[in-house]
Curated annotation (Swiss-Prot):
GO terms for molecular function: rRNA binding; structural constituent of ribosome. Belongs to the universal ribosomal protein uL15 family. The keyword Ribonucleoprotein applies. SUPFAM superfamilies: Ribosomal proteins L15p and L18e. The lineage of its organism: Archaea, Thermoproteota, Thermoprotei, Thermoproteales, Thermoproteaceae. InterPro entries: Rbsml_uL15_N, Ribosomal_uL15, Ribosomal_uL15/eL18, Ribosomal_uL15/eL18_sf, Ribosomal_uL15_CS. This is Large ribosomal subunit protein uL15.
Length: 156
């Protein structure tokens, strides 16, 4: 391809700065006031005042928080003890609960829940497998003659 201009190094031989003004203006970070965030409390304060939030100086200063990765965070799907007592009849008809030593065994993870809360009234003796249960829920199920067994959050 044809070159339509001459290189500056070629036609500026002997000029010392090759079109960059005074000596040192085309060197590293000296002409721009330093590298990166240098000087925002000194000679670049006008940039903070112009582009930063008033009062806080964000995004130049201060803590900026932390966004937890979605792979770590758990989406809780709770169910109350009272609602579980209502569901037991339906679950029994569908065959999603089994009987063990005169008590019904319910796995909340298989039902789509991962937390047991203590709202409502429980009168059915149940053995409940769940990753998380509140203190009130454990007490109500124990009072009805059942028990809560804590399992891993990973689906079995």
């Amino acid at each position: 391809m044809v070159r339509r201009f001459k290189r500056a190094t070629k036609y500026r031989r002997g000029s010392r700065t090759h079109g960059w003004g005074r000596v040192g203006q085309h060197r590293k970070s000296g002409g721009s006031g330093g590298k990166g965030m240098v000087g925002f409390h000194k000679h670049k304060w006008s940039l903070v005042m112009k582009y930063g939030e008033s009062g806080t100086g964000w995004p130049f200063y201060g803590k900026h928080g932390f966004k937890q990765p979605e792979t770590i965070s758990v989406e809780w799907r709770p169910i109350n003890v009272g609602r579980l007592a209502e569901l037991v009849k339906e679950l029994r008809e569908r065959g999603e609960v089994r009987e063990e030593e005169g008590r019904l065994v319910v796995d909340l993870l298989k039902l789509g829940y991962n937390k047991l809360l203590g709202g409502g009234h429980m009168d059915v003796p149940l053995v409940v497998y769940t990753p998380v249960a509140s203190k009130a829920a454990v007490e109500k199920i124990a009072k009805a003659g059942g028990e809560v067994r804590i399992v891993s959050l990973v689906h079995r």
